[in-house]
Amino acid sequence: MNDSAHIDYARYDHIRPLLWTGDALELLDQRKLPFEVAHVRCDSSDAVAEAIHSLAVRGAPAIGIAAGWGVVLAARDIAADDGSAALQKLEPALLRLNAARPTAVNLAWALMRMRRVLGAAGADWREVIAREAQAIADEDLAANRHMGALGAALIAPGSGVLTHCNTGSLATAGFGTALGVIRAGMAQQRIAKVFAGETRPWLQGARLTVWELHQDGIDATLIADSAASHLMKSGLVQWVIVGADRICANGDTANKIGTYQLAIAARHHGVKFMVVAPSSTVDMATASGDQIEIEQRDPGELFGVGGVRTVADGIHAWNPVFDVTPGDLIDAIVTERGVIAQPDLARMQAAFGS
């Protein structure tokens, strides 16, 4: 069986959702996939904030990376003698970037990193923040590849897996979190079958995940979100593998809406449940999922598909885009720092501090 050192990254890691050109941030427009490969060029921090809010770029790690480059773009509009002075002038732009998606902790984490290096920088503060933005991206890619190996090692050869939303290269600097585990598991011949839920209402599973896997030559089977419990009952999957937008001190995990019901069904059917996310997603300052702000998006997103209305006029809709899975329904949280089995407050504190 191949180990992680023998993963063919040229095959399994060639999609990139973000490209810093030196002049602008170019984003692969994920709203148009899979039928059109187009890019959004962001020349300002406000353009980056709008791209994050409108889901042109999405996925917790990817929006954190985008925000870092957004700070670099905002710096072009100000003059300052040192980083501390620059930080005061940049704070409004940082606040606008942070408000673009409130649930994902990576966004606030990346902006805090930029604040920290700015506050300590001297006259070379522009170079300092550019290096930090690049470091955020580079560290994410390295973390994803390491998490892929750690997560794959938990999976018995011949297993079937189910994933939700999109947690691949499109959601990160590359390779992916949960999808990185799946890529590594396929390369190591541990995973025999991959299923992906469609993930209403934005269909990230149908539009993005199966498209990504197809690019890698991985045969993935798409299911309706409502078919997941029946799939688990059939015995075709042994693991549900998902990403995260925020992981609390007690292991409670916010992720794409529909994750919670997958965890409930998995526990009922004896299917293991794995969360894969970089340590930047861990928020030890938030005690439990009850304290997480859940983003509510336009109810109109539920009224149709692809711009075609499927719901009668006058209908109301409720559209939370994340839910919280209790830590006691999670078998393993995988980060680049290691695997936390049966996460709870004590195990999370041992791994990440208090």
Curated annotation (Swiss-Prot):
Its EC number is 5.3.1.23. Belongs to the eIF-2B alpha/beta/delta subunits family. MtnA subfamily. The record marks C165 as: Transition state stabilizer. Transmembrane segments: none annotated. It comes from Xanthomonas axonopodis pv. citri (strain 306). It is an enzyme of class 5 (isomerase). GO terms for biological process: L-methionine salvage from methylthioadenosine. It comes from the Bacteria. It catalyses: 5-(methylsulfanyl)-alpha-D-ribose 1-phosphate = 5-(methylsulfanyl)-D-ribulose 1-phosphate. The active site is at D245 (proton donor). This is Methylthioribose-1-phosphate isomerase. Catalyzes the interconversion of methylthioribose-1-phosphate (MTR-1-P) into methylthioribulose-1-phosphate (MTRu-1-P).
